[in-house]
């Protein structure tokens, strides 16, 4: 009976550590997202959602790269906690598809149909291109000797 209680306690501990890792990754990603948006607005202005485009493209690259480099055939071993910290926590906190949707709606409400269409088109193509690029780069690294 004591062994069963110990195993149940260990399972709860493991879950708490995993949730903590995801939460910490989300905090770090969220802070970097906010800083990126502020920086993009300062550099490029506020007429187009540059910050959101940047974080979603960068996050797509990171998740494509990390999922491949740390996957079953990857060169880097990463346990579940680390993978969840990076992919669910950090990338989830860093990217912001809800803000993308809101910014697109605001462009439409301002009757900026070309801007909204450009935001949607460029974003989707860039996200897919970035995740593909990250995956491709990590796949090549995985095949290197050594």
What are these language model-derived features?
Residues 1-146:
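Membrane-interface helix-loop junctions in multi-pass transporters/channels
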